[in-house]
A protein has these predicted regions:
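Short, structured coil segments at secondary-structure junctions
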Residues: 69, 120-122
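Short acidic-hydrophobic, aromatic-tinged amphipathic segments that line or gate anion-handling sites
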Residues: 74-75, 125-128
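Active-site neighborhoods of divalent-metal-dependent phosphate/nucleic-acid chemistry enzymes
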Residues: 57, 68-115
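Short, well-structured N-terminal submotif of metal-dependent ribonuclease cores
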Residues: 1-37, 51-64, 106, 115-116, ...
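Phosphate/NTP-binding elements of NTP-utilizing enzymes
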Residues: 45
Length: 129
């Protein structure tokens, strides 16, 4: 499978793997799966750090390089931006819209714990349950 991790799943996989369901931990460790990450998640993590909601240790560019090293980088294209605007999400969070649209356009499975994204129906998802 080609798995696009949402921001929380990515951060939990790095620092709090116990928050991930066992089946999800297995999928993330399965070498047959491709793990993808959007730069939107990096942006969101840096915003959370700046607001004091999470702590990222050390030099931020170095942290980003290490935290993203094992992931394929999902592009943010005009096609994805248009798809994000057209998604029928119940809230205007741009990060969630971009992640869902990225999964939709690139044919990736979005790994998330967000019920709003899990209930979208227009994209393949893998739940953290």
């Amino acid at each position: 499978m080609k798995l696009l991790l949402d921001t929380h799943i990515w951060l939990w996989s790095l620092g709090e793997p116990a928050r991930l369901a066992r089946h999800l931990q297995r999928e993330l460790q399965n070498d047959e799966n491709e793990l993808w990450l959007s730069p939107v998640s990096t942006w969101e993590a840096l915003l959370l750090h700046a607001k004091g909601r999470i702590r990222l240790h050390g030099d931020l560019p170095k942290w980003v390089a290490q935290a993203t090293a094992h992931f394929r980088e999902a592009p943010l294209t005009h096609e994805i931006v248009i798809a994000a605007q057209q998604l029928p999400l119940s809230h205007p969070d741009p990060a969630d819209r971009f992640l869902a649209a990225t999964a939709q356009v690139l044919g990736l499975t979005l790994v998330t714990a967000d019920e709003r994204l899990l209930g979208l129906g227009k994209i393949a998802t893998l739940a953290n349950r």
